[in-house]
Amino acid sequence: MRWPCSSWFRGLWPEAAPWAVLLALGVPGWVLAVSATVAAVVPEQHVSSAGQAPLDWLLTDRGPFHRAQEYADFMERYRQGFTTRYRIYREFARWKVNNLALERRDFFSLPLPLAPEFVRNIRLLGRRPNLQQVTENLIKKYGTHFLLSATLGGEESLTIFVDKRKLSRKSETTGGIPVVGGTGNSSAVSLETLHQLAASYFIDRESTLRRLHHIQIATGAIKVTETRTGPLGCSNYDNLDSVSSVLVQSPENKVQLLGLQVLLPEHLRERFVAAALSYITCSSEGELVCRENDCWCKCSPTFPECNCPDADIQAMEDSLLQIQDSWATHNRQFEESEEFQTLLKRLPSDRFLNSTAISQYWTMDSNLQHRYQQLGASLKVLLKKMHRIVRRLFNLCKRCHRQPRFRLPKERSLSFWWNRIQSLLYCGESTFPGTFLEQSHSCTCPYDQSSCQGPIPCALGEGPACAHCASDNSTRCGSCNPGYVLAQGLCRPEVAESLENFLGLETDLQDLELKYLLQKRDSRIEVHSIFISNDMRLGSWFDPSWRKRMLLTLKSNKYKPGLVHVMLALSLQICLTKNSTLEPVMAIYVNPFGGSHSESWFMPVNEGNFPDWERTNVDAAAQCQNWTITLGNRWKTFFETVHVYLRSRIKSLDDSSNETIYYEPLEMTDPSKNLGYMKINTLQVFGYSLPFDPDAIRDLILQLDYPYTQGSQDSALLQLIELRDRVNQLSPPGKVRLDLFSCLLRHRLKLANNEVGRIQSSLRAFNSKLPNPVEYETGKLCS
């Protein structure tokens, strides 16, 4: 049903309103649809009993809903002690309002009934107004939109706040219906009475309010509030802004607005839209500019920071700070949780726990794992929210001179929590625990705490760690692992005692000193040995056509049982007859400690980095030369016997080459065709002898099976390993070291093969337990 209202609105509304809210233009006519409804009593229970927890958490500021007037009323009533709200209301007089002025223009081509003042302001703009003029003359006075259609209406309601704890229960004891008298001072009131009075509100308003006010004064258990909003009928409203709560917005009744530019002449429409967008978006502080899918405000000189919404940026930065506080709260709650504290109580205190040990206890605690997963889930939610705010913050600040200031929290790793447990265990002797440093076994205390470190138990483990802590003081070691010795409560690497009692190895000569002594052929470095040969004699000429074998031996077991010998150089003085074309060729074999010839090693003369023979003339007439090979400190080695195999070759010089070619001499039956003779005057070994005590080494070996005291077996093994390594260091050059130590045991200590093998196995087993063991492969030399 449509009918016009009896009054007309005057022109445009003069006051501006925000964006997307009604910015008024008066309408010359109304289309009204009247309806009224009455609602039932609606109770809202907020606190069920006196023992329930208070609702203070609900009364905090949480958004627009909590700032609504009705909620403010509820909050006030609740804080005064009321627990229940009864509300009866009815909506009345809803009118559907349509703008007939546009319909008359669109359908009947009638001119718009614009207000004279509005028309005058349009004319004052001229043909080409700037945006500031449009804003001052139109937008600030009339807004940016006008009303197409809306729904008007009102509401009246009665609200009763009730405190059930204060209601009288006399009616329950008497069993009668409570009667509320106008003069009684002790009337019994029940909830049923309040229901009946609320239901009669719209029937007899004045009588109902009078009785309710009497109950309110008499009992103090209720509080009555009456609310009436909206127009009471189709009255003469000149301006809708003067009516409170007029517009009714609901899904079926929406306010429809239209831009004010449709009422303006064609030449003003584009300028008006630009001015309206700048006014709304830039708050009259600049001009809106859009390029390449991006819009911003071109700020005026008066407002250089118009693109920078300080309030919004500050609010987002505050939100980030709140999230950081929540982040820290979650971590603190996890540390204070029952699961975390239970793990701390279960950890052993009689030994030190490193990060690896704590991680094992951490992994085995299923309850703690579940609690840690909850912490991770909560932090992920906060991190997602923080990233969303940060993106919005950067979008807002991309045209600001000041960049946003914030710090993203980082999720604490498992290693952090393991170190935190160590800090609580060992650095908690003050109000605030310090930070434990596992590498230095110390605590870093807070700046205001002089000391926070408590007793730190000894560390159990391999290597330098303790095997057991002391029973009387857990901070000190009680026993150590093999290869370490206990010293002042700590495990230090065990070092072998001096080997001077077994084998003296500290008489090395410097290279320059050795070279000088060899040049002088100093007798102090000559090792006197026995020359043996069945093929020749020293100082006698012989025919070198066939191989000659000679050797120098010491026979130490017979003559020098307390010495072992080191060879530094080998020298021969060889003489040749005049015009001889023979060239001596020698093969040298060295036997280190005795035994058969098969237990000797071949000297690789001039191979690789090994030295070659050096020849110096002694007697030019007899063509004598000293042939010397110098091993020096680099290639020195043990020797007991030196085998020399001498052969000769014919030396000739090829005219087409600078190389020397050797030929094996032919067998000459005619002495007249002999190519020459050879003589060896001396064969000497230069070096030095070392003191050697085989009995002391035998006693050391006996301690492997029969230790004198506790720890003597380990000490004996360490000394034997040191002796083995130092003897094998003088092994001859080669890809694999020769096992000279086994030769020493076999030939100088006269041990059986099985005994030597058992000793070597014991040394290898003990060496594998030592810290940083050095293993090397050795080749067998002695059988």
UniProtKB/Swiss-Prot annotation:
<dbReference type="GO" id="GO:0045666">
    <property type="term" value="P:positive regulation of neuron differentiation"/>
</dbReference>
<dbReference type="GO" id="GO:0045930">
    <property type="term" value="P:negative regulation of mitotic cell cycle"/>
</dbReference>
<dbReference type="Pfam" id="PF25415">
    <property type="entry name" value="EGF_BRNP1-3"/>
</dbReference>
<dbReference type="GO" id="GO:0043025">
    <property type="term" value="C:neuronal cell body"/>
</dbReference>
<keyword id="KW-0732">Signal</keyword>
<dbReference type="Pfam" id="PF01823">
    <property type="entry name" value="MACPF"/>
</dbReference>
<feature type="signal peptide">
    <location>
        <begin position="1"/>
        <end position="33"/>
    </location>
</feature>
<dbReference type="Pfam" id="PF19052">
    <property type="entry name" value="BRINP"/>
</dbReference>
<keyword id="KW-0131">Cell cycle</keyword>
<dbReference type="GO" id="GO:0030425">
    <property type="term" value="C:dendrite"/>
</dbReference>
<feature type="glycosylation site" description="N-linked (GlcNAc...) asparagine">
    <location>
        <position position="579"/>
    </location>
</feature>
<dbReference type="GO" id="GO:0035264">
    <property type="term" value="P:multicellular organism growth"/>
</dbReference>
<feature type="glycosylation site" description="N-linked (GlcNAc...) asparagine">
    <location>
        <position position="185"/>
    </location>
</feature>
<keyword id="KW-0325">Glycoprotein</keyword>
<comment type="similarity">
    <text>Belongs to the BRINP family.</text>
</comment>
<dbReference type="GO" id="GO:0071300">
    <property type="term" value="P:cellular response to retinoic acid"/>
</dbReference>
<dbReference type="GO" id="GO:0007399">
    <property type="term" value="P:nervous system development"/>
</dbReference>
<feature type="glycosylation site" description="N-linked (GlcNAc...) asparagine">
    <location>
        <position position="354"/>
    </location>
</feature>
<comment type="function">
    <text>Inhibits neuronal cell proliferation by negative regulation of the cell cycle transition.</text>
</comment>
<feature type="glycosylation site" description="N-linked (GlcNAc...) asparagine">
    <location>
        <position position="626"/>
    </location>
</feature>
<dbReference type="InterPro" id="IPR020864">
    <property type="entry name" value="MACPF"/>
</dbReference>
<feature type="glycosylation site" description="N-linked (GlcNAc...) asparagine">
    <location>
        <position position="658"/>
    </location>
</feature>
<dbReference type="GO" id="GO:0005576">
    <property type="term" value="C:extracellular region"/>
</dbReference>
<feature type="domain" description="MACPF">
    <location>
        <begin position="85"/>
        <end position="281"/>
    </location>
</feature>
<dbReference type="InterPro" id="IPR033237">
    <property type="entry name" value="BRINP"/>
</dbReference>
<protein>
    <recommendedName>
        <fullName>BMP/retinoic acid-inducible neural-specific protein 2</fullName>
    </recommendedName>
</protein>
<dbReference type="GO" id="GO:0040011">
    <property type="term" value="P:locomotion"/>
</dbReference>
<keyword id="KW-0338">Growth arrest</keyword>
<feature type="glycosylation site" description="N-linked (GlcNAc...) asparagine">
    <location>
        <position position="473"/>
    </location>
</feature>
<keyword id="KW-0964">Secreted</keyword>
<dbReference type="GO" id="GO:0021953">
    <property type="term" value="P:central nervous system neuron differentiation"/>
</dbReference>
